Amino acid sequence: MINNLDIKPDIKLSVKQTFGIDSDLEIEAFSKKNEYVPEIDKNYIFDKDTTLAILSGFSFNKRVLVQGYHGTGKSTHIEQVAARQNWPCIRINLDSHVSRIDLIGKDAISIKDGKQITEFKEGILPWSIQNPVALVFDEYDAGRPDVMFVIQRVLEADGSFTLLDKNKVIKQNKYFRLFATSNTIGLGDTTGLYHGTQQINQGQMDRWNIAVSYTHLTLPTKRIV
C-alpha cells in the first residue's frame, strides 16, 4: 500500500435493484473495481436494517458500528455492501497484538541514493484516511486502550489526523469511510461468552453515529442453510 488511489464515485446504483430492499434510494458507487474491492458473493442475502445502516455510512459519511453474536456475518455484511459499490474495503482485526505503531507507522531502514537511511513509514491508518477506502475494525471491543485512543482521533467525520512523528496533519479523503464490528456494545462481557473484550470509553462510543444490532440470521438465510 504505497500509492494513493486517485478515484472517486462516478455512478449511481438503485438500492432496490442492488440489494433487494424495497427503497427508492440511490447510492454512489465506483464504476471500476480495484484490488482492494471484496469479491461479490452472488448468493448473499442482505438484512434490511443492517444494510440500510451500512449504506448510511457510505452515503452520508456516518461512523457505523455493527454489533452481534459471533458467526452472524457482521464483517461480511459490510464487505458485501462495499463489493456491490466497488468501494475499496480493508479489514483490520483488533486483537491484542495490534499496537499503536501498527496503525500509525514506525521508523524503518531503507536505501535511498545508494545509502542506508532511517525514515518514517506510515501505517495502514494514515494511508486509509488519505484514500477513498472503507476501513473496518473487526473485534472492535477487544482493542487495546492505546489503540482505541488512536482510533478516537478519526471517529469525527472530516476530522484531521496529526502524525507527530512527521509533524504532518492529514486531512480525511472525502470518500474515506469508517466501520467497526463488535460482539458487545461497549459495556464489556456480561455473558461470559467473550473473554478478552473490554469496556469502551463512553466518550468514544458516543462518536459512533449509528449502532446497529445484527444478532440473528434472517429467515431466508436459515432456509438456505
Predicted features and spans:
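AAA+ P-loop NTPase catalytic core and its hallmark functional loops
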Residues: 2-217
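Single conserved hydrophobic/aromatic residue that forms the stacking wall/gate
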Residues: 216-225
